[in-house]
Amino acid sequence: MQSQMYVPPLSKLNKYIIILYVALFILGKILLSNGINLSSYLALTSGGIKSGLIFQLITFPFIDTQFITVLFNCLILWFIGSELENKWSALFYVKFLGVVTYLPGVVFLLMGLIIGKSMNFVPYFGLNGLNLGLLVAYAMIFSERTMLFMFIFPMKAKYFCMLLAGVEMYMALSGNAYSSSWMHLLSMGLAYGYLCYMSYVARGGSLMAYKAKMDREKMKGKLTLIKNEEEEKPKSSDPKYWQ
């Protein structure tokens, strides 16, 4: 029996993201043919923020320059993102996207402001980080499901995610300090950490409860059992042997 690939319905939120993403890609190509580089205005750069282009903090995920990247990102949003949005609520899905997309952007911007001129116009853009975060979430929830690496090689979701993390790590280490792969790895780490924390909260935990638990454990470690030596000494009247 041949296995059939499950295609989830495209969710409303992901449909809007894909429409905006593709529209800006097409607009960027049209403007580039007329000598205008749209990504230089909408991609995130510390130089752009210093120049007053604050909107870059919002627009940077929706800009991309390569057709194949746009295609794969749209497919992941459809196949992976839609299933996760349907499993979660739309509100939780939006929060997750915000964490894995915009927090790395803020970190990238802070790096640019700290490093200075050499990073002023190094851009950060695209949905790669977001989609890697979605794949981490998918691997955590559906770890035993089979996915097709490069649409050819079947492997379990958890191993597929590990492979992608390894590829990003290799690209980060073989590139320069400004490589966007570092931000993609951060997106993956944030996805894992956020879901672990939200799972802990769903079970009734909180940061305050965790701190209180750690404090109790530390207090237990400081407690020492003190024996009363006088009580341990046998009385002369006590029998020395029991039969």
Where is each model-derived feature located?
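Membrane-helix interface "capping/anchor" motifs
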Residues: 86-91, 141-158
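Juxtamembrane/interfacial segments flanking transmembrane helices
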Residues: 35-37, 142-152, 197-207
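Hydrophobic, membrane-inserted alpha-helices
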Residues: 75-79, 161-171
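Membrane-interface micro-motifs in multi-pass membrane enzymes
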Residues: 114, 118-143, 154-157
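N-terminal TM1-TM2 helical hairpin plus the immediately adjacent luminal interfacial "cap"
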Residues: 7-124, 175-183
